[in-house]
Amino acid sequence: MYKWLIPAAAAMLAGCAATPGAQLAETKPAASVSNAVPYHWTLGNAPQAHKDMVAEFGKVGLKPGEYVWASTAPSQGDTRIVVDLLTQMTYVYRGDKLLGASSMSSAKTGHITPYGNWTILEKRPFYRSKKYDNAPMPFMQRIDDYGIAFHGGVNPGYPASHGCIRLPMKFAEKLYGVTRLGTKVIIEG
């Protein structure tokens, strides 16, 4: 299926070969990335967000339905959201400062919360699902063309949604208040 990748990868790796007799430097993994948890896809944002939560709030983990939010927030800097599907956590930053962290619920078996880089495409303070029996989706923030969105909802702390990222209601409201259309969303796990 991906046979076209093999020649390209071989050509790329050929350029990485060491010169005979050359001294190779020892390389170490970046300090900001933890390999302790088996991520399927990560650029290091989710593991770093967890470290930032511990440093900022002194919390190692949150129970289902729990969240933390900073008492002060910088007025400058881009807002971004980091979602960790592996640990069922959502983090929000402004610039380099972690504003908040929350437990969440993503897609249950048979459904998908997609990995990757996204942006907020639509925001509505109250919305009803067109796919799932007119289900309420308060503080809805859609990130793709198929209906995947952040919203307030039932948060058991494990994957239980049809693909959306369900958040505790108060956290969903706070998140809605600090984002705008185009806010970056990174989903890892």
Regions picked out by a protein language model, each given a short descriptive name:
Residues 2-138, 146-165, 169-189:
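N-terminal pre-domains immediately preceding structured catalytic cores
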